[in-house]
């Protein structure tokens, strides 16, 4: 299937590893020009090399900077003013008991997970509306629906993304611009691998995975962590012109963890 993404310019925030890297790779494979973003020159150059090794003809650009910072977001928009596709992927997570989460952590999570996407959307949405085409995708989480007791501050940010995504879609009614949220479930990313190492006590990953889905996420229908590529496959489609009738949606790629049909 041709997703008609050739020469579309896509920005994926936080795209040097994990789900972001998989999304950037998927978009590049479909012919999009992709801006790779990370906080350091080394992380960006490593990601660029990795994608080029897999896709030699990929058209890639790099931007080093923390897009949770307002001034850096402005710099991004000045350097790349004509983005067609914006994937708000930048985010952090950290399990912590509610009683131990200080105000500073609440603000930090909101700044990175929520305001980064708000700012980039505010910068790029007017241009998309002007040319009557564009795609904005927020990478939320099933944790925005099923708030995890072990990281309530993270769940709060993911719920906020759902509200922002739907609200922005309402402002695009009657245009060729769509705004959607994609909700991954437990996904085996770099961050999750590190999280597993801390919790597993030296157990093999397969053993930990089996126990995790038995005791922590028993509602999962696939009984395993999704791959970053499985998440990216949905995101890349939502970014394409073929997804023109999908707007204002919260699309789950959660392995059936959320026990509802909608």
What is the predicted function of each stretch?
Residues 9, 16-17:
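Conserved glycine-rich cofactor-binding loop
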Residues 97-98, 105-110, 216:
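Substrate-binding pocket helix/loop in short-chain dehydrogenase/reductase
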Residues 121, 157, 165:
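Active-site helix of classical SDR
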Residues 126, 170-171, 244:
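Alpha-helical segment proximal to the catalytic Tyr-Lys
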Residues 141:
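Residue(s) in the substrate-gating loop at a strand-loop-helix junction
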Residues 146, 236, 242, 247-262:
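Short C-terminal tail/terminal secondary-structure segment
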Residues 173, 178, 246-248:
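Short, small/polar-rich loop/turn modules that mediate ligand/substrate recognition or access, typified
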């Amino acid at each position: 299937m041709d997703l008609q993404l050739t020469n579309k310019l896509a920005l994926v925030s936080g795209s040097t590893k994990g789900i972001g890297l998989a999304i950037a790779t998927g978009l590049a494979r479909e012919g999009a020009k992709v801006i790779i973003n990370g906080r350091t020159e080394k992380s960006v150059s490593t990601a660029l090399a990795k994608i080029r090794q897999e896709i030699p003809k990929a058209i890639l650009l790099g931007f080093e900077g923390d897009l949770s910072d307002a001034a850096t977001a402005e710099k991004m928009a000045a350097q790349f003013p004509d983005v067609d596709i914006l994937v708000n992927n930048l985010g952090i997570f950290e399990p912590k008991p509610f009683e131990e989460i200080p105000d500073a952590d609440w603000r930090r999570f909101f700044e990175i997970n929520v305001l980064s996407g708000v700012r980039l959307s505010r910068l790029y949405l007017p241009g998309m509306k002007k040319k009557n085409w564009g795609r904005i995708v927020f990478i939320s989480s099933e944790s925005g629906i099923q708030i995890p007791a072990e990281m309530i501050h993270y769940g709060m940010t993911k719920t906020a993304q759902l509200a922002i995504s739907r609200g922005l879609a309402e402002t695009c009614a009657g245009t060729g611009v769509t705004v959607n949220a994609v909700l991954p479930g437990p996904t085996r990313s770099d961050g999750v691998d590190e999280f597993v190492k801390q919790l597993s006590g030296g157990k093999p990953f397969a053993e930990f995975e089996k126990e995790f889905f038995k005791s922590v996420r028993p509602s999962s229908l696939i009984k395993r962590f999704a791959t970053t590529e499985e998440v990216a496959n949905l995101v890349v489609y939502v970014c394409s012109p073929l997804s023109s009738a999908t707007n204002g949606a919260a699309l789950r790629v959660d392995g059936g963890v959320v026990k509802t049909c909608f």
